[in-house]
């Protein structure tokens, strides 16, 4: 879509210009090894590294002159191999930043890819070597790399029907999952009724609704916190499972009159989960033991974050947040590993900002401008299909995320989406209604709705950059945009996304 004719104003209140910038103010398993030794699976990892059977490459030939067997340039390979033994990829905005693609690329150079929090509300879209699209919600994005073991950690809430649907879809397309997906025995089970009461809860809130994905994430974490939740390990004890499920369903019926529960529902669910338990058994693993054993054996581990810091239960725009910790702290609590072993964290941020659902959005572009940016970037939720709200890159929020997580570097995604614009704005400062500057990202939602955003306006490049693979080949204005972001947040940008394909990535 050509959006070059549009100057995407954020409804400025006042505008001032200077030679360089203009500012505007805006309201803004181990398979079968769970009861034995974990070294068997780790040894298999080493053998796979020695005997790779498939070369995965992009459908588009990279322009770099020297590439490894996965289509990564020599400079890119050097950048990836410099990452620490335990590294992580986390979102810097309100989710949907494109984390899955980077994880998919990095996974080829790691032994293990692990999810530590969230559930099926995390939607990651990745592509295989034939360009086929996969939308994953529970299975880590590293699954397309057959040498990688994927771990679903104790901090994840697992909806078994959804997990099996993803596994079936992957295997029907030739992606082997047996022995490659390990599900923590400590992870909590998310039931269909959690999804039902998620909708009932939203209906209760009426106009104050949070805008959840209605995947049952919040209700499941609520069950966990009030200590009547059911864990994966409970599937091994079908003698007590019915009583635990009855208590859980009875509590839900007592709280929500609209939720109809009776003996027949319990019988049906118990029979259903007996079958699920049998199928899941080969995947169930003490992942805390597995992860720490892998660390001691110097295996490389990549942590794939779901959602993003601005949706964190503690640091996000509460209550318009998720129910877990998608920031750095969630890695340790969601996998059972020590803080001292966690090394490089890469923050993923779009070249602009999007948000799904309700909640403050200081740099949102209202009206036609937001609609055009949404269609140019195909901004529709992977999990829900809902249109995402769109706006300019919020430097204040990004700097806040960098402070919380201590990112070693950033991955700037979807830079190509801005290619048709004649000018691009960066939200660089928050001001109180009286004009005074806020020195931090506020927790007060009323203040977030009232504050004014000061923008810098940079020149656009108005040319197609999707085939470029070297940073120096980007138009000058595109490089100035990247470098201005680095300057404002104080964190280097090492990866730049310029398209959806696996190879559409610039290593800086």
UniProtKB/Swiss-Prot annotation:
Substrate binds at residues 382-388. GTP binds at residues 95-101, 123-125, 388, 414-416, 497-499. It comes from the Eukaryota. Its EC number is 6.3.4.4. Keywords: Chloroplast, GTP-binding, Ligase, Magnesium, Metal-binding, Nucleotide-binding, Plastid, Purine biosynthesis, Transit peptide. This is Adenylosuccinate synthetase 1, chloroplastic. Mg(2+) binds at residues 96, 123. Residues 1-56 form a transit peptide. It comes from Capsicum frutescens. NCBIfam families: PRK01117.1, purA. Binds 1 Mg(2+) ion per subunit. The lineage of its organism: Eukaryota, Viridiplantae, Streptophyta, Embryophyta, Tracheophyta. GO terms for cellular component: chloroplast. Belongs to the adenylosuccinate synthetase family. PROSITE patterns: ADENYLOSUCCIN_SYN_1, ADENYLOSUCCIN_SYN_2. Transmembrane segments: none annotated. Homodimer. InterPro entries: Adenylosuccin_syn_GTP-bd (IPR018220), Adenylosuccin_syn_Lys_AS (IPR033128), Adenylosuccinate_synth_dom1 (IPR042109), Adenylosuccinate_synth_dom2 (IPR042110), Adenylosuccinate_synth_dom3 (IPR042111), Adenylosuccinate_synthetase (IPR001114), P-loop_NTPase (IPR027417). IMP binds at residues 96-99, 121-124, 213, 227, 307, 322, 386.
């Amino acid at each position: 879509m050509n959006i070059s004719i549009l100057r995407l104003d954020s409804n400025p209140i006042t505008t001032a210009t200077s030679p360089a910038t203009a500012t505007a103010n805006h309201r803004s398993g181990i398979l079968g090894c769970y009861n034995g030794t974990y070294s068997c699976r780790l040894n298999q990892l080493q053998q796979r590294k020695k005997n790779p059977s498939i070369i995965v490459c992009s459908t588009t030939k990279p322009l770099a002159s020297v590439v490894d067997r996965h289509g990564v340039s020599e400079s890119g390979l050097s950048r990836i191999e410099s990452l620490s033994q335990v590294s992580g990829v986390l979102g810097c905005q309100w989710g949907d930043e494109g984390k899955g693609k980077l994880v998919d690329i990095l996974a080829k150079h790691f032994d293990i890819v692990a999810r530590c929090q969230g559930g099926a509300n995390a939607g990651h879209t990745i592509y295989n070597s034939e360009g086929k699209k996969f939308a994953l919600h529970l299975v880590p994005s590293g699954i397309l790399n057959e040498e990688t073991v994927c771990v679903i950690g104790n901090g994840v809430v697992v909806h078994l029907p959804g997990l099996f649907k993803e596994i079936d879809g992957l295997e029907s397309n030739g992606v082997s999952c047996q022995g490659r997906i390990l599900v923590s025995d400590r992870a909590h089970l998310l039931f269909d009724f959690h999804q039902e009461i998620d909708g009932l809860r939203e209906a209760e809130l009426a106009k104050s609704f949070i805008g959840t994905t209605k995947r049952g994430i919040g209700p499941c974490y609520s069950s966990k916190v009030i200590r009547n939740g059911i864990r994966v390990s409970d599937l091994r004890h079908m003698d007590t499972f019915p009583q635990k499920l009855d208590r859980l369903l009875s509590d839900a019926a007592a709280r929500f009159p609209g939720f109809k529960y009776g003996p027949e529902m319990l019988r049906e669910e118990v029979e259903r989960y007996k079958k699920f338990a049998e199928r899941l058994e080969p995947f169930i693993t003490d992942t805390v033991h597995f992860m720490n054993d892998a660390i001691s054996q110097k295996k490389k581990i990549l942590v794939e974050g779901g959602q993003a810091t601005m949706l964190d239960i503690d640091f996000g725009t509460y209550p318009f947040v998720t129910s877990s910790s998608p920031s750095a702290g969630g890695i340790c609590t969601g996998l059972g590993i020590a803080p001292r072993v966690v090394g490089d964290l890469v923050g993923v941020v779009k070249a602009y900002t999007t948000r799904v659902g309700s909640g403050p959005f200081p740099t949102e572009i209202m009206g036609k401008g937001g609609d055009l940016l949404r269609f140019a970037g195909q901004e529709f939720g992977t999990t829900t299909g809902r249109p995402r709200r769109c706006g300019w890159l919020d430097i204040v929020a990004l700097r806040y995320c960098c402070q919380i997580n201590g990112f070693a570097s950033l991955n700037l995604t979807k830079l190509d989406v801005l290619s048709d614009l004649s000018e691009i704005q960066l939200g660089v400062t928050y001001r109180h209604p009286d004009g005074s500057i806020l020195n931090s990202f506020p927790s007060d939602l009323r203040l977030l709705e009232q504050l004014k955003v000061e923008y810098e306006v940079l020149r656009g490049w108005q040319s197609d950059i999707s085939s470029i693979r070297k940073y120096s080949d980007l138009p000058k204005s595109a490089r100035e945009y990247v470098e201005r972001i680095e300057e404002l947040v104080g964190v280097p940008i090492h990866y730049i996304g310029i398209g959806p394909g696996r190879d559409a990535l610039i290593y800086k």
